[in-house]
Amino acid sequence: MWIQVRTIDGSQTRTIEDVSRKATIEELRERVWALFDVRPECQRLFYRGKQLENGYTLFDYDVGLNDIIQLLVRPDSSLPSTSKQNDAQVKPSSHNPPKVKKTARGGSSSQPSTSARTCLIDPGFGLYKVNELVDARDVGLGAWFEAHIHSVTRASDGHSRGKTPLKNGSSYKRTNGNVNHNSKENTNKLDNVPSTSNSDSVAADEDVIYHIEYDEYPESGILEMNVKDLRPRARTILKWNELNVGDVVMVNYNVENPGKRGFWYDAEITTLKTISRTKKEVRVKVFLGGSEGTLNDCRVMSVDEIFKIEKPGAHPISFADGKFLRKNDPECDLCGGDPDKTCHMCSCHKCGEKRDPNMQLLCDECNMAYHIYCLSPPLDKVPEEEYWYCPSCKTDSSEVVKAGERLKLSKKKAKMPSASTESRRDWGRGMACVGRTKECTIVPSNHYGPIPGIPVGSTWRFRVQVSEAGVHRPHVGGIHGRSNDGAYSLVLAGGFEDEVDRGDEFTYTGSGGKNLAGNKRIGAPSADQTLTNMNRALALNCDAPLDDKIGAESRNWRAGKPVRVIRSFKGRKISKYAPEEGNRYDGIYKVVKYWPEISSSHGFLVWRYLLRRDDVEPAPWTSEGIERSRRLCLRLQYPAGYPSEKEGKKTKGQSKKQGSEATKRPASDDECPGDSKVLKASDSTDAVEAFQLTPQQQRLIREDCQNQKLWDEVLASLVEGPNFLKKLEQSFMCVCCQELVYQPVTTECFHNVCKDCLQRSFKAQVFSCPACRHDLGQNYVMVLNETLQTLLDLFFPGYSKGR
């Protein structure tokens, strides 16, 4: 096994070869010292967010093949002297205020009573009086909200005329039903001297700053407003016979969802239509204010709530005359904002009661509110911590492994045979223990027949690569199958000396009969084999009734289930058809017959199988197969990150061995041509054999007009041979599931998405294309592209079976 070590800045990367998964972190530090010239005490090693500590192995941290470990070089001056310095944590400041839930319409104990705000106070200047009810325009939304004058001051030199800055330079943002604002309350003293109206001082009012407070959003605090964003509170509802086309009125409209109640905007009436005695329609042009412009042809949902816009100088009103509050979009769609109705979404998530808002805590993760006395266990007071998480979102600190701490015990690893064995054998160096780095998903694991894109003659250096390609899934097992279905693939590795291999036909010995207790991979035969498990699975591939006594012979051997056969270099000792290095895919075989017999090598009963080749592709040891492998540029495939020096040494050693064998004996006539030579990239001088399309595939590609641009790009890679299928898979990959698209829906923006994936997107109220975010609309009809589905089934037979 090999791993990579990279500096934290990414400037240097080194490969550590021949490392065991059982290697300790101390041994790894020594290897890093030799490569980076960094002493072990100056190293901080990280893998997947964890700091590697001494006393553990790479297996404890699940370090796999070709994984990257990051190296942080610790300066000598900052070497920790005690463990406390390593575990020092930056504590959050305790003076930060706790997060307490505030209700939008709930009153605060610090607010003055309504009776104290009923008296209008004339400050002696300005158009509006203190405590006067007004409508204030949100400069960001252009909507009008109910407010009252808190105080009136003269504009200083620091204020810009014509603008509406917020107090202390703070900013605020309001969405439908919510206000987010940070500001301090105004502390100016009011001159409690009543005076008369001052409505004729409009010209001098531009130098006056009005400090207002929203009636329904007291948590926004005191805001500074200019006179152009204020007007007297709307109080008159216009009747149907009072409405005229061209009038500018105030209507309720939801910009994001026109079918629901929203905010209040100025609008010009464009259409008045009487549909029936009780049903009327009003269409307006909504003024959003600022740079937002207008919205044309907007239908008003509440035709019986159209307000007259009051002009400056209108009769002033206060809370003594009434609240004059209009209906806005409810803060909660579940309860409609009803203060008397329990709701677990907008109030306490535990009890649902809308009481004691000052005793509610907001979770910093899910944003749900909880009463401190509804928690388990209940809290006596609001905590002083800056961040608080509810019981559902809180991470158990005992499960978090901090830097410098020891790993938590894994129940899964404690049950492994390697955890209880007393053997000192270093099993961590084997490639069978590294695990897959990727998985074949183009076809399901129970797929019969060839794997799309894997031609006969493909060779891999290690068995784990064969598993990643999907040709033979097990890392170690010789047969892959299911006892109630059949066998899908097998590896011919020469495990029994009395097996016979004739190339197109060979005998295969079943599995079992060996003592593999503990963590053993091989063992001497110690019992008779039985026709169960994988032996039974392989027997089911024979076109004959199952017989676990004397076996059976197929009635028509070509009618049996196909088996993918991989020949391993280990079988070279008994077969000249095996490759000299690696594991080679030799095509499809069928089971001709199976029978029990006593093995001549160890004397126990074994089950034998006779398999015969049934593949249209030529065998890799024939002259046609060698030529085809050369045309397809098939060569020995190494894993990603495999050391090039090791590859060069192996190639050099093989050439010497082949030369010595050539001088010892001449090649016999019955020896297979080419002797399963593995081609290198330098051996290929001709162009790669182009991928051939069938007439049916060509016709269907012409019919798929929606994806013509994609097909033009894909067909350009036909000259690359087997790589054509890889290009095809990448081009028609679903952006949602990252798999080859299944039951494709070609959108109007010419992107292909799985129908199930698009339905899940629509179910989540996302009505746009997952690839480009083009708006498809809520009523979009998903039409299955059957032509594309047929094409993909032809190029990748069996891929839709497991979807």
Curated annotation (Swiss-Prot):
Residues 658-668 have a biased composition (Basic and acidic residues). Mostly detected in several tissues, including the thymus, spleen, lung, adrenal gland, and ovary. In addition, found in several tissues in the brain (cerebellum, hippocampus, and cerebral cortex). Residues 449-613 form the YDG domain. It is found in: Nucleus; Chromosome. The keyword Disulfide bond applies. The gene is Uhrf2. PANTHER family: E3 UBIQUITIN-PROTEIN LIGASE UHRF-RELATED, E3 UBIQUITIN-PROTEIN LIGASE UHRF2. Residues 79-96, 106-115, 167-181, 189-200 have a biased composition (Polar residues). It catalyses: S-ubiquitinyl-[E2 ubiquitin-conjugating enzyme]-L-cysteine + [acceptor protein]-L-lysine = [E2 ubiquitin-conjugating enzyme]-L-cysteine + N(6)-ubiquitinyl-[acceptor protein]-L-lysine. Its main location: nucleus. Its EC number is 2.3.2.27. Disruption phenotype: Deletion mice are viable, fertile, and grossly normal. However, adult mice develop frequent spontaneous seizures and display abnormal electrical activities in brain. In addition, they display reduced 5-hydroxymethylcytosine (5hmC) in genomic DNA in the brain together with impaired spatial memory acquisition and retention. It comes from Mus musculus. This is E3 ubiquitin-protein ligase UHRF2.
